[in-house]
Amino acid sequence: KIARAEVDGERLSDTEITAFCGLLFIAGGETTDKAIANMWWNLWQQPELFHHVTAHPQAWDNAFSETMRRTPAVVNEDRFTTRPVEWHGREIQAGTRVRISIGAANLDPTVFRDPLCFDPDRSDLHSGKELRSGASPEPGRAGHLGFGLGKHFCIGYELARTEAIVGSRQLVERCPNLRPAPGPATRPQIQGNSFQALLAFPLVFDPAH
């Protein structure tokens, strides 16, 4: 599809196609690993949750959705106004950079009950394949904004979800009794202007026999 894509009736050049593919690889590598680490960190804050998902592999799906709500890898996105706009009594000129906090929106108490609580089985969150609209086909449930919204929705969201879930299952299968290494605990931190991730999350496991 990329090779045949057109912009204003013209095909993309080889340079544009190469640059776009490079962006996909970089974007996926920079965010998916953080999402996986954040998910594992969240689960290990309540060890019974980690043991539950390892015993019931289908539960990884809900755990990933809740991670993308509670501690998404990307917490802020920048946009630029295309025209003057007034927002809550403040005039914003055209061409102004506006920072949108995905992380804050995902913690809106009017949308999610007890939003600071990590609960993979919460009844107010749409789990499973994300929707570009951010809505949910299920009454009473809302989608998280961890992958963005609308035309800015993450193009690689399905790959990211698959990598996180399949990768976690494989890691558990191949590393017996996988658990956090002894030592002081860390938590996901804001890095730069956009990312939320662990600085380190060492794990240990028993030798395979």
Residue ranges and their predicted role:
Residues 1-209:
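Cytochrome P450
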